[in-house]
């Protein structure tokens, strides 16, 4: 039950953050789903960071990892919105924007996980140097 509560708390925070950031970014880009792209890239970066700090550096407890990854980042990122917005671009025959959205989301999100990993390794090395 405690784990479910952690996921729910993280999910609430992640959903509110996604709504806020995505809406703020999207206000300037009416014809391209940039808000969803940004939250997915940012979420991927933090997922890479948290997972590497948790799994390989032991900096987070299992409960904190669950709260952050499954709860907060699970609600912050959104495959369903990406899929819906991509389908809408397809329906509107905006094939160039559709291609850009799919390629940018996949490539930048994977690269963001990599940057999260590198950041985690650098942070862990820095923290070891302080001790």
Curated annotation (Swiss-Prot):
<keyword id="KW-1003">Cell membrane</keyword>
<feature type="transmembrane region" description="Helical">
    <location>
        <begin position="32"/>
        <end position="52"/>
    </location>
</feature>
<keyword id="KW-0813">Transport</keyword>
<dbReference type="GO" id="GO:1903425">
    <property type="term" value="F:fluoride transmembrane transporter activity"/>
</dbReference>
<dbReference type="GO" id="GO:0140114">
    <property type="term" value="P:cellular detoxification of fluoride"/>
</dbReference>
<dbReference type="GO" id="GO:0046872">
    <property type="term" value="F:metal ion binding"/>
</dbReference>
<keyword id="KW-1133">Transmembrane helix</keyword>
<comment type="similarity">
    <text>Belongs to the fluoride channel Fluc/FEX (TC 1.A.43) family.</text>
</comment>
<feature type="transmembrane region" description="Helical">
    <location>
        <begin position="4"/>
        <end position="24"/>
    </location>
</feature>
<dbReference type="GO" id="GO:0062054">
    <property type="term" value="F:fluoride channel activity"/>
</dbReference>
<dbReference type="InterPro" id="IPR003691">
    <property type="entry name" value="FluC"/>
</dbReference>
<dbReference type="GO" id="GO:1903424">
    <property type="term" value="P:fluoride transmembrane transport"/>
</dbReference>
<feature type="binding site">
    <location>
        <position position="74"/>
    </location>
    <ligand>
        <name>Na(+)</name>
    </ligand>
</feature>
<dbReference type="GO" id="GO:0005886">
    <property type="term" value="C:plasma membrane"/>
</dbReference>
<keyword id="KW-0407">Ion channel</keyword>
<comment type="function">
    <text>Fluoride-specific ion channel. Important for reducing fluoride concentration in the cell, thus reducing its toxicity.</text>
</comment>
<keyword id="KW-0812">Transmembrane</keyword>
<feature type="transmembrane region" description="Helical">
    <location>
        <begin position="66"/>
        <end position="86"/>
    </location>
</feature>
<feature type="transmembrane region" description="Helical">
    <location>
        <begin position="95"/>
        <end position="115"/>
    </location>
</feature>
<keyword id="KW-0479">Metal-binding</keyword>
<dbReference type="Pfam" id="PF02537">
    <property type="entry name" value="CRCB"/>
</dbReference>
<keyword id="KW-0406">Ion transport</keyword>
<keyword id="KW-0472">Membrane</keyword>
<keyword id="KW-0915">Sodium</keyword>
<feature type="binding site">
    <location>
        <position position="77"/>
    </location>
    <ligand>
        <name>Na(+)</name>
    </ligand>
</feature>
<protein>
    <recommendedName>
        <fullName>Fluoride-specific ion channel FluC 1</fullName>
    </recommendedName>
</protein>
